[in-house]
Amino acid sequence: LNLDKIPMIKLLKNETESELLIKRQKTKNNCLSKLHEISKVEIPLIAEIGINHNGDINLAKKMMIASKNSGCNFAKFQYYQKDVRIQKNNETEFLHETADGTELSLNDVLERSRLKKEDCLELIKYGESINLPVFFTVFDVESALIIRNMGQKIVKVASMDCNNYDLHSNLNSIGFETIIISTGMSDIREVSKAISIYDQNLEILIMSCRSSYPTSLEDVDLGEISYL
């Protein structure tokens, strides 16, 4: 699918959404994003630490230092409530094999890697001490409220939640200034609908993503970046 040849306006059925997207595009041209403003670099780099710390805060800090030394401008983690993120009937399914061959359920992985509120506060403070701002991907409203109350103004929505319109609606009203949305597995209609939910005063950053690891070269489609 060559997105460069498909006018966004024709893909949207809702005229209000179309008008909103056009207006948002006009207002954002030639403006630096919050990430540019904070990092003061032309291309901000975000270290996707996610849950790779395995719940070990000391390891998370070491990964932050490595990210800083590698030239990254931000570090991003995941913050979630496990009972909300995974359904009860899936807790023992989706086995994950660790490096030593041990099999863990998705429930085990999420529980082991889950950050507590005090962990998030510690990582934010540590990021300030090494000049590496921290922000989080959230998967539920409770987590979003918690990190907003920590003073966080930037939040990220994962690809799996791009079409979670209830989450977008709640993020719109919580008080964040910048919403970053990943778009892996979503089509342009879903992306457009997500954007249309947000008020004009919010900064929305759309990320071109591929939810396959590693991504084959024929699926990369870097031309999508300028389209989005």
State what each model feature region is:
Residues 2-228:
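Catalytic cores and adjacent flexible loops of soluble metabolic enzymes
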